[in-house]
C-alpha cells in the first residue's frame, strides 16, 4: 500500500505507479475533495490497483470529521482513519493539544464508533484492500416471494457483505449467510455462499 503524505498525485504519477511499480497493489488517499488532493472512491481501478480512501485523519475530532464519519457509515458502513506520525510535532494538526489530549480524543472517537456500529469489522489496510476487491467484483440477482428473499451472487470469492432493507415481513432463518440487525428494517448481510436465502416471517 502506498500513501503520499500530501495526498497529491497527478495523473502522470498515477500512471507511472501502475506501470513501473507493479508490486504496489493499493493506493490510499482522500475520499473528500481537497486542494490538489488525489480523490478516490472505494473501488478497483482499471489497472488493477485498489483505491482505498481514508475518510478522516488526525486527532482533532471536529464537527466536520464527525459528519464525514457518520456519512460514510450510512453510505458504505465503512470507517477508515489515518493519523500522521508527525501530528505530534505539528501544532496545526494537534501538537498544541499535547499527546494526552490527542490520545483522549482518539479513544473517545473509537468508543463512539464501537458503540454506534458494533458490527464493523476491524481490518488492517491490507485486509480492507481485499474487502474492496470483493466488493467491487461481486454482483447479484434478487428473487423475492411471499416466503423468502433469495440472492444469487456472481464473482463470489469467499464472502461478501450487503446492506439489506427488508420492508415486508420479518427475517427468519438464513441459509448461506448471516444477517445482523442494524436499525429499523436495515440489516447487514454476510454472504458465505454464492446463494443466500432469507426466510420471511409474517409480522
Please provide the spans of the model-predicted regions:
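C-terminal beta-strand-rich structural cap/linker in extracellular carbohydrate-active enzymes
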Residues: 182-203
Amino acid at each position: 500500500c502506498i500513501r503520499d503524505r500530501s495526498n497529491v498525485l497527478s495523473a502522470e504519477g498515477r500512471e507511472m505507479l501502475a506501470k513501473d511499480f507493479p508490486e504496489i497493489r493499493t493506493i490510499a488517499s482522500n475520499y473528500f475533495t481537497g486542494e490538489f488532493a488525489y480523490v478516490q472512491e472505494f473501488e478497483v481501478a482499471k489497472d488493477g490497483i485498489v483505491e482505498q480512501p481514508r475518510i478522516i485523519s488526525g486527532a482533532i475530532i471536529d464537527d466536520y470529521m464527525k459528519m464525514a464519519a457518520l456519512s460514510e457509515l450510512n453510505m458504505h458502513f465503512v470507517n477508515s482513519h489515518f493519523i500522521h506520525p508527525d501530528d505530534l510535532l505539528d501544532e496545526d494538526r494537534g501538537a498544541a493539544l499535547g499527546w494526552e489530549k490527542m490520545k483522549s480524543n482518539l479513544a473517545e472517537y473509537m468508543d463512539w464508533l464501537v458503540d454506534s456500529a458494533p458490527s464493523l469489522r476491524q481490518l488492517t489496510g491490507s485486509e480492507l484492500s481485499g474487502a474492496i476487491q470483493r466488493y467491487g467484483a461481486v454482483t447479484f440477482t434478487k428473487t423475492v416471494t411471499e416466503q423468502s428473499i433469495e440472492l444469487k451472487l456472481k464473482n463470489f470469492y469467499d464472502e461478501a457483505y450487503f446492506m439489506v432493507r427488508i420492508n415486508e415481513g420479518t427475517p427468519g432463518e438464513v441459509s448461506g449467510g448471516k444477517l445482523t440487525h442494524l436499525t429499523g428494517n436495515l440489516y447487514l448481510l454476510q454472504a458465505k455462499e454464492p446463494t443466500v436465502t432469507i426466510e420471511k416471517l409474517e409480522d
